[in-house]
């Protein structure tokens, strides 16, 4: 919206991604899709010690129950002690997101903040997480990968299930994982 009316946004990913002087912990980029249009969005998480006994869970633009489920899966399947931590989650641009294909990016941002380590530069995520910690393919995975490649990302982390037939554009490494237990290694490129 401008002073002279509405203007179309040719590249919504531009307004949903921030640019920082140096990498920061707690920030991950997710490849999402709204209908047929893929876009990238910055996920921000802050994990800190619970100061008042009962940990806080606060989200802006995301279902709080789903975040609770993702945190429980992290605790059970990765061994992260989330019951002692306050967790705050936000999407850049004030977006409200219901896409389960962003689960992997949300968990990536939480892991990054928990360990206070930035995600490696040029990394993007797309995948749904199940209760057993498995990483499932996000709908329209191929379009999400293409959007990440188009915007210059060097690596995208996706589900290893059913991605053998997905076209892999030049210039982007497609890293497949089957469980969130594999995610920290892929995020920090260890």
Predicted regions and their residues:
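Peripheral, non-AAA+ core regions of ATP-driven protein-machinery
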Residues: 1-30, 37-190
């Amino acid at each position: 919206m401008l002073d002279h009316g509405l203007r179309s946004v040719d590249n919504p990913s531009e307004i949903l991604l921030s640019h920082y002087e140096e990498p920061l912990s707690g920030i991950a980029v997710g490849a999402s899709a709204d209908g047929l249009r893929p876009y990238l969005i910055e996920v921000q998480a802050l994990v800190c010690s619970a100061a008042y006994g009962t940990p806080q869970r606060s989200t802006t633009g995301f279902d709080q129950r789903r975040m609770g489920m993702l945190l429980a899966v992290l605790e059970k399947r990765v061994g992260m002690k989330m019951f002692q931590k306050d967790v705050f989650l936000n999407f850049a641009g004030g977006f409200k997101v219901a896409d389960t294909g962003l689960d992997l990016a949300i968990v990536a941002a939480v892991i990054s903040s928990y360990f206070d380590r930035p995600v490696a530069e040029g990394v993007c995520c797309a995948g749904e997480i199940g209760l057993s910690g498995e990483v499932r393919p996000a709908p329209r995975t191929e379009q999400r990968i293409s959007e990440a490649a188009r915007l210059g990302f060097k690596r995208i982390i996706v589900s290893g299930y059913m991605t053998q037939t997905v076209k892999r554009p030049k210039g982007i490494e497609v890293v497949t994982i089957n469980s969130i237990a594999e995610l920290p290694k892929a995020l920090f490129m260890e």
